[in-house]
């Protein structure tokens, strides 16, 4: 039976493709979700992609991941990365292997973006690869889970 992973996207990621394309590129959230589904399938995984502009909804999905025995998480918490102790605590609390991902290189941007509350709850963090960071995150998560690429 295929293992499920959640790909969670936070605030403003629904605007990918139109919001500051010089920073985030022209790819849309639909493009991200298609990339995630295809990448996960290549490892025999199922990617469930969700996006919310609400912190509490993201936390509820993290808790749901635990109750549904989801194998792993990929999270782009958007601006909540730099502000949300609650997301950090939820991730630590569920003890599910997690990869943090960001489309832009947060360290080449404003100083406030240089701190991540999510990073300490994740086994890996990726930034600056555009939406390809999601492919890299799922590939790394698959390796952590012991999932092999399917032919």
Curated annotation (Swiss-Prot):
Record-listed substrate binding positions: 76, 82, 89, 103-104, 113
Active-site annotation: 24 (proton acceptor), 102 (proton donor)
Catalytic activity: 3-dehydroquinate = 3-dehydroshikimate + H2O
Keywords assigned: Amino-acid biosynthesis, Aromatic amino acid biosynthesis, Lyase
UniProt EC number: 4.2.1.10
Keyword Amino-acid biosynthesis: yes
An example Gene Ontology molecular-function term: 3-dehydroquinate dehydratase activity
Pathway: Metabolic intermediate biosynthesis; chorismate biosynthesis; chorismate from D-erythrose 4-phosphate and phosphoenolpyruvate: step 3/7
GO biological process: amino acid biosynthetic process; aromatic amino acid family biosynthetic process; chorismate biosynthetic process; quinate catabolic process
Subunit structure: Homododecamer.
Protein's job: Catalyzes a trans-dehydration via an enolate intermediate.
Record-stated family: Belongs to the type-II 3-dehydroquinase family.
Protein name: 3-dehydroquinate dehydratase
Organism of origin: Rhodopseudomonas palustris (strain ATCC BAA-98 / CGA009)
Lineage: Bacteria, Pseudomonadati, Pseudomonadota, Alphaproteobacteria, Hyphomicrobiales
């Amino acid at each position: 039976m295929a293992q499920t992973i959640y790909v969670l996207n936070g605030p403003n990621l629904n605007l990918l493709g139109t919001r500051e394309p010089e920073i985030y590129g022209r790819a849309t959230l639909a493009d991200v979700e298609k990339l995630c589904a295809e990448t996960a399938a290549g490892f025999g995984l199922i990617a469930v992609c969700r996006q919310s502009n609400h912190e509490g909804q993201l936390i509820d999905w993290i808790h749901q991941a635990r109750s549904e025995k989801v194998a792993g998480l990929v999270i782009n918490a958007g601006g909540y990365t730099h502000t949300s102790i609650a997301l950090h605590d939820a991730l630590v609390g569920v003890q599910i292997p997690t990869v943090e991902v960001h489309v832009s290189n947060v360290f080449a941007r404003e100083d406030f973006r240089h701190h991540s509350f999510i990073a300490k709850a994740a086994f890996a963090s990726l930034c600056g690869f555009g939406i390809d960071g999601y492919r890299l995150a799922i590939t790394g998560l698959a390796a952590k889970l012991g999932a092999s690429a399917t032919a």
